[in-house]
Regions:
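Periplasmic c-type cytochrome electron-transfer domains
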Residues: 6, 21-343
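Bacterial N-terminal signal peptides
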Residues: 9-17
Length: 343
């Protein structure tokens, strides 16, 4: 009898150990006591997306995080959202100037950084998507990026019982559909907020600029904030910033308007240290080279932004001080935040 009891107990222990060895690492929950609430930072504008119809919960956030890092969202199971949006680069991509998709394809635009998305009114360089919940679908179906269909993605997820359980935890039932997929990913991406840079600390009265940083800040306010408005450091507009003319028509690809040719969305200047290379096509490798473009490299065209018609006057000293200020916009805590790392 004792031997039979021992065998039963041993079998249970063995089964448990085998199960733990094969538990999907992506099922690791968000660490306990982790704050995933969405809070509007002091002195920031009201966000465009406030989770009113997509309540942010630990289960929804964990599901969205898993989906964000899951390569099964692509046709050949090789590319995830994180393949082009890595946390260490402020959710941009550093190893390719343009997006890298399935079958080693390269897109024609730089992967934009993903942070503070809840304040955005449109998405992608051309503003082709105007609601954050529709944003995750576009790269899934893009033939150069993930080249997958939504029915196939849903089928893959449904075939995984651990996903069915996570959808139940997040939404009440095991049903997996496109709307729930969208909402889960947005619970993760929408909660990615970067507001712990030195600039933010200065604005909150917890730090002070150096003399060069302060001088650079004054220059920024004089030369740059027309397009890169504080505190998000973008006004979300579309502008032609004088880059060399290519076949990419930018915003005009969406609107069909000749007046929008070669206009692209103004990016945020936060976290520039992590998000290089720069510009819509990833063609400029350094901040210094970006400033050189604005002082001496502007290409004239009919839709060039009026503020750049005469280029921007900056001395070498001005550039140095401006870069010192721009470096205060880097959020070193954000790129290490355990809430956003790959599970």
């Amino acid at each position: 009898m004792k031997n039979r009891i021992f065998l039963v107990v041993f079998s249970l222990v063995l089964v448990c150990n085998l199960w733990s060895c094969h538990t999907d690492p992506l099922l690791q929950p968000v660490p306990k006591n982790t704050d995933i609430s969405f809070v509007q930072p002091a002195n920031w504008p009201t966000p465009n997306y406030n989770f009113q119809n997509n309540t942010l919960t630990p289960d929804g956030f964990a599901l969205g995080r898993r989906l964000f890092y899951d390569t099964r969202l692509s046709i050949d199971n090789t590319i995830s959202c994180a393949s082009c949006h890595e946390q260490t680069t402020a959710f941009a991509q550093i190893d390719h100037p343009t997006s890298h998709g399935v079958r080693n394809q390269l897109g024609n635009r730089n992967s934009p950084a993903l942070f503070n998305l809840a304040w955005h009114t449109s998405f992608f360089w051309d503003g082709g998507v105007n609601h954050i919940e529709n944003q995750p679908i576009a790269p899934i179906m893009n033939p150069v990026e993930m080249d997958e269909t939504l029915p196939n993605v849903i089928a893959k997820l449904n075939a995984d019982p651990t996903y069915r359980q996570q959808f139940k935890n997040a939404f009440g039932t095991e049903e997996i559909n496109t709307q729930r997929l969208q909402k889960a990913i947005v619970q993760f991406m929408g909660a990615i907020v970067s507001n712990q840079s030195k600039y933010d600390q200065v604005k909150n009265g917890k730090a002070s600029f150096t003399a060069d940083e302060q001088a650079g800040y004054v220059l920024f306010q004089q030369k740059c904030n027309t397009c890169h408005a504080e505190p998000l450091f973008t006004d979300f507009s579309f502008r032609n910033n004088g880059m060399p003319i290519t076949l990419d028509s930018g915003r005009a690809h969406i609107t069909g308007l000749a007046s929008d040719r070669f206009k692209f969305k103004v990016p945020s200047l936060r976290n520039l240290n992590f998000t290089k290379p720069y510009m819509h096509n990833g063609s400029i490798a350094s901040i210094g080279a970006v400033l050189d473009h604005y002082t001496s490299g502007i290409v004239q065209s009919p839709t060039l932004d009026p503020s750049l018609q005469n280029q921007i006057t900056l001395s070498a000293t001005d550039k140095s001080k401006l870069i010192a200020f721009l470096n205060t916009l880097n959020d070193y805590e954000f790129v290490k935040d355990v809430r956003f790392k790959q599970p």
